[in-house]
Amino acid sequence: MARAPLDWIDRELEALEAKGLRRALEPLASPQGPVVEVGGRRLVNLCSNDYLGLAADPRLRSAAAEAAEREGAGSGASRLVAGDLPVHGALERAIAGHAGTEAALLFGSGYHANAGVPPALVGRDDAVFSDVLNHASIVDGCLLSRAKLVRYRHADVQELADLLAGTPARRKLVVTDAIFSMDGDAAPLREIAGLCDRHGAMLYVDEAHATGVLGPRGGGLAEALGVADRVDVHMGTLGKALGAAGAFVAGERRLVDLLVSRARTFVFTTAPAPAASAAALAALAIVEAEPERRARVLALAARMRVGLERLGFDVSRVAAPIFPVILGDEARAVAASRALRERGFFVRAIRPPTVPRGTSRLRVTLTAAHGEAQVDAFLGALEEVLRVPGGGAPRVL
């Protein structure tokens, strides 16, 4: 029976519906892949973060099944109690080796890592500097830290320099996404690292959308730019390019030792399931052994970039297989998503509050499992859905 104290929720849901902002789940009837079954139809999947096409890889499935048989379905407890299993340590050692750091620590998700690490590093007498377009989990972690939150304009190195110089604090922490998830552009990490060196600030880089994709060994943007040794906190996810689940923080041994004691999202949660960690361990080996996967997805991204620019979209700053097809208002983005589905493509509309009002978009992503023909077919379908009058801004028909 519905309880009266929750009646306010009905009004909230009605308001969300009226604004076109109410969200709903839509389950897949197939594993992740370049083509998925949704709503009884098989559609080309252009909204997954499975960048290397590993989520349904038989090697990951086998590793997960073997780990479940060997170590059980669940971990049963926090790692500080009775949930620290052999596969967790094996994965952490492999991550540290891949990242070139002394140690690494697993978290249940990227949100857990970003929400838990900043509060372990800074507090009331400190300041944390965050790009205005950082992921929501970073913002939440900064707020939970109770440090002074100083937000700087997106990728604005000069403003960050001024703020670092003009903000007194016991400790200073600069936090940035490596690749920004809604726009696909890269942070100016070389310049940010230089500012952190100059001001004695710690540097935290969220490589969620760069891990496995960028860099000679798939280490991320910091590796690609040659500044990995100047990053104090490397955060990456295991559920995007690596196709499994969970996240990690890599860095100096003393950093990890502190997080084991102070990161509440590590201490007060059940350890990751053995199957997920084993799948991630298998994926990491594939990332190192098969660089052609990175080359493949980046080549497809280059093809998509050319096609979108031909249609009038500015994607010149995109540095990863993430493309913002910005259409403006929410209704226009939703209409485009529906029209593309009718043409066989699964692309979700991204609306406020995920992106700023007036920038609703289609967020188009690619994986190494896609083909050139699928990219070209999508561009053709998008051209049908959009009209470009007189070379002006694209709009939905």
UniProtKB/Swiss-Prot annotation:
Listed Pfam families: Aminotran_1_2
Binding positions for substrate per the UniProt entry: 23, 135, 354
Gene3D superfamilies xref list: Aspartate Aminotransferase, domain 1 (3.90.1150.10), Type I PLP-dependent aspartate aminotransferase-like (Major domain) (3.40.640.10)
MF-aspect GO terms: 8-amino-7-oxononanoate synthase activity; pyridoxal phosphate binding
Modified residues (N6-(pyridoxal phosphate)lysine): 240
Pathway participation: Cofactor biosynthesis; biotin biosynthesis
CDD domains linked: KBL_like
Gene Ontology terms describing biological process: biotin biosynthetic process
Required cofactor names: pyridoxal 5'-phosphate
Subunit-structure text: Homodimer.
Assigned protein family: Belongs to the class-II pyridoxal-phosphate-dependent aminotransferase family. BioF subfamily.
Protein name: 8-amino-7-oxononanoate synthase
